[in-house]
Amino acid sequence: MASATFSVAKPSLQGFSEFSGLRNSSALPFAKRSSSDEFVSFVSFQTSAMRSNGGYRKGVTEAKIKVAINGFGRIGRNFLRCWHGRKDSPLDVVVINDTGGVKQASHLLKYDSTLGIFDADVKPSGDSALSVDGKIIKIVSDRNPSNLPWGELGIDLVIEGTGVFVDRDGAGKHLQAGAKKVLITAPGKGDIPTYVVGVNAELYSHEDTIISNASCTTNCLAPFVKVLDQKFGIIKGTMTTTHSYTGDQRLLDASHRDLRRARAAALNIVPTSTGAAKAVALVLPNLKGKLNGIALRVPTPNVSVVDLVVQVSKKTFAEEVNAAFRDAAEKELKGILDVCDEPLVSVDFRCSDVSSTIDSSLTMVMGDDMVKVIAWYDNEWGYSQRVVDLADIVANNWK
């Protein structure tokens, strides 16, 4: 039997471009402040594209759409920070539904253990509103979406960030309350259309009243899986996401429907399920049944990393795989995919705007058809940037 060959990517080979650094939010006082105008401009161009006879044309938004945030937790607050950092946004956030009240909403938006202090003037405005750099955002509090004043406030789009109302019946309560559309910041259940920016968001139709932005892990996985499948043809594969713990876990051992997640999050590596790999088929239908995976929740508060191993139909080697990623990152996936040549660790990817960053030195090919790819992602900030992008697409295709 012939021995299998093994190749590991060497970033310095063949004149590959050097990693130019992560894009950091200006909201971070401790981060290196570099201009993200190129990123924002590119995304603005992408999200302003409208379908027209199978092609695209620049969209024009005559008026901002009114946006409500339902659930002001990790994603809700990250979304607001991301939106606040965008210039000329077609979105107007006018109300937040949060059971904690104005004082808590204001404090937790301003001071964040992961993001640091928000570089904005944030304060309560009376007993029922929040002020962010003078922008007044109303605060309401009701656990039943059907009771929310969306009709009275003229809400066009609800950012559903509770993680609870993820099916048509649940998310549909926002429509019953008078909202026109709902964007779920989690995997949707049932037949809810799922979109991943950079992968299939161009298929969005204004006729969709409830849509899903998929999960943070699917947003990381799908862009580079799309590249792998287009360039080399994926036969099958498995994925493991080493994922920071989330609010769904227990700080100390306590009851939970998942016995593993019942254990102390900061003390354990917690194996659990994830539908992220299978969900890729929702945005790349030709991969249905070809991918599966698990999650390992680890004692870090933010930033996660995907480890994908796939068998491909076209023979290849590590440098060729990385070259395909670099090409996509400079072209169709610019602002969505990045490639890193530096020997970094998880904290270095905090507040990275992109959906996934390929760790080029860890790309491997076993034999010539088994490919291993490692990709980093900020499971809160990067994901929230895509929620803003998808909301922009909704706004720029408004009729």
UniProtKB/Swiss-Prot annotation:
Chief location category: plastid
UniProt entry keywords in alphabetical sequence: Calvin cycle, Chloroplast, NADP, Oxidoreductase, Plastid, Transit peptide
Entry EC number(s): 1.2.1.13
Reaction equations catalysed: D-glyceraldehyde 3-phosphate + phosphate + NADP(+) = (2R)-3-phospho-glyceroyl phosphate + NADPH + H(+)
GO molecular function: glyceraldehyde-3-phosphate dehydrogenase (NADP+) (phosphorylating) activity; mRNA binding; NAD binding; NADP binding; salicylic acid binding
Catalytic residues as annotated in Swiss-Prot or TrEMBL: C216
Residues annotated to bind NADP(+): R74, I75, D98, R143, N379
Compartments in which it is found: Plastid, Chloroplast stroma
GO cellular component, one term: apoplast
Pathway: Carbohydrate biosynthesis; Calvin cycle
Matching InterPro entries: GlycerAld/Erythrose_P_DH (IPR020831), GlycerAld_3-P_DH_AS (IPR020830), GlycerAld_3-P_DH_cat (IPR020829), GlycerAld_3-P_DH_NAD(P)-bd (IPR020828), Glyceraldehyde-3-P_DH_1 (IPR006424), NAD(P)-bd_dom_sf (IPR036291)
Transit peptide interval: 1-48
Site (Activates thiol group during catalysis): H243
GO biological process: glucose metabolic process; reductive pentose-phosphate cycle
Record-listed D-glyceraldehyde 3-phosphate binding positions: S215, C216, T217, T246, T274, G275, R297
Misc remark: Plants contain three types of GAPDH: NAD-dependent cytosolic forms which participate in glycolysis, NAD-dependent chloroplastic forms which participate in plastidic glycolysis and NADP-dependent chloroplastic forms which participate in the photosynthetic reductive pentose phosphate pathway (Calvin-Benson cycle). All the forms are encoded by distinct genes.
Subunit organization: Tetramer of either four A chains (GAPDH 2) or two A and two B chains (GAPDH 1).
PANTHER family given in the database record: GLYCERALDEHYDE-3-PHOSPHATE DEHYDROGENASE 2
Entry function: Involved in the photosynthetic reductive pentose phosphate pathway (Calvin-Benson cycle). Catalyzes the reduction of 1,3-diphosphoglycerate by NADPH.
Assigned protein family: Belongs to the glyceraldehyde-3-phosphate dehydrogenase family.
This protein's name: Glyceraldehyde-3-phosphate dehydrogenase GAPA2, chloroplastic
Taxonomic source organism: Arabidopsis thaliana
Gene: GAPA2
